């Protein structure tokens, strides 16, 4: 088995999908989880205005709507959380995403004050954060807020991780990567677009250039620039297609060096890091 085949198998990626079937699969997955653990009353998700959180948010709300109707349990809710750092440049996209999702509840937590306070506390201890590390601080502060909300609403935190993100480890460890349940896991980027199109999402929300937008020195830096490959390249690779050798090497290097991000904390029983 080639490394490409191993990666595809590990991430559960498929060369083709039926959008309606995958929508149903994700909704049923979320519903089954909630029914298995009846003490869970809410799904909590940060909404950025990008493709992934828009899709995950819509699926969460659809799952909650169906489950309330089927069970009569009106205590179930989906909570969409806005988590700007100061003023967000694409705030209108966030509002458009919320209008599309129609969440039961929308909360806004501006993380700038908390990030600056943490940065100052570290500075006083003699640690000056780089712009890159400050970006990770933002991602972790966003996740901390979501877990606080989940803790106070008997909820779980929903993630947006999918195959095209997991393969490169393009997320912050214990930041946006630290979630309870990931309904998009298995899909690549173009497949996520297919689901949103089938759901009637406004096109500009999934045709915009994806960006983590964490670094102050490089605001709105496109993911594809940071990664050195395009999402079309990544999607082709995940679909088992032949890609240029340099593209394959770049993707595989990302996968191998970020393996620790896709695993629990390393113990004496792990040996993947020795290979």
Swiss-Prot record:
Query: What catalytic reaction does the record list?
Result: deamido-NAD(+) + NH4(+) + ATP = AMP + diphosphate + NAD(+) + H(+)
Listed binding positions for deamido-NAD(+) are 140, 173, 180, 260-261
Purpose? Catalyzes the ATP-dependent amidation of deamido-NAD to form NAD. Uses ammonia as a nitrogen source.
Subunit arrangement? Homodimer.
What keywords were assigned to this record?
Answer: ATP-binding, Ligase, Magnesium, Metal-binding, NAD, Nucleotide-binding
- Judged by the first EC level, this protein's enzyme class is ligase
| GO MF annotation list | ATP binding; glutaminase activity; metal ion binding; NAD+ synthase (glutamine-hydrolyzing) activity; NAD+ synthase activity
Q: Which residues form a coiled coil?
A: none
Which pathway does the database say it acts in?
Cofactor biosynthesis; NAD(+) biosynthesis; NAD(+) from deamido-NAD(+) (ammonia route): step 1/1
Task: Name the chain's protein.
Answer: NH(3)-dependent NAD(+) synthetase
Q: Which organism was this protein described from?
A: Escherichia coli O139:H28 (strain E24377A / ETEC)
Report which gene this protein is encoded by.
nadE
Xref: CDD domains: NAD_synthase
User: For binding ATP, which residues are annotated in this chain's numbering?
Assistant: 46-53, 160, 189, 211
Q: Which GO terms describe its biological process?
A: NAD biosynthetic process
A single GO cellular-component term from the record reads:
cytoplasm
**Amino acids binding Mg(2+):** 52, 165
């Amino acid at each position: 088995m080639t490394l490409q085949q191993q990666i595809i198998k590990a991430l559960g990626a498929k060369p083709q999908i039926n959008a309606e079937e995958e929508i149903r699969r994700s909704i049923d997955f979320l519903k089954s989880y909630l029914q298995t653990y009846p003490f869970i009353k809410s799904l909590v998700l940060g909404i950025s205005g990008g493709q992934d959180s828009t899709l995950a948010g819509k699926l969460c709300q659809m799952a909650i709507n169906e489950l309330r109707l089927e069970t009569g349990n009106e205590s179930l809710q989906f909570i969409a959380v806005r988590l700007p750092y100061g003023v967000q440049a694409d705030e209108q996209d966030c509002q458009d995403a919320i209008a599309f999702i129609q969440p039961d509840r929308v909360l806004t937590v501006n993380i700038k004050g908390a990030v600056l306070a943490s940065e100052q506390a570290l500075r006083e201890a003699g640690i000056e954060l780089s712009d890159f590390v400050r970006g990770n601080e933002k991602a972790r502060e966003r996740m901390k807020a979501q877990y606080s909300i989940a803790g106070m609403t008997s909820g779980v935190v929903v993630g947006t991780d999918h195959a095209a993100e997991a393969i490169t480890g393009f997320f912050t460890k214990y930041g946006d990567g630290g979630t309870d349940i990931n309904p998009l896991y298995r899909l690549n980027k173009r497949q996520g677009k297919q689901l949103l199109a089938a759901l009637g999402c406004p096109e500009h929300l999934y045709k915009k250039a994806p960006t983590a937008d964490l670094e102050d020195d490089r605001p709105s830096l496109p993911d594809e620039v940071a990664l050195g490959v395009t999402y079309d390249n990544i999607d082709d690779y995940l679909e088992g297609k032949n890609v240029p050798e340099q593209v394959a090497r770049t993707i595989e290097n990302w996968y191998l060096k970020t393996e620790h991000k896709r695993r629990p904390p390393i113990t004496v029983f792990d040996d993947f890091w020795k290979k």
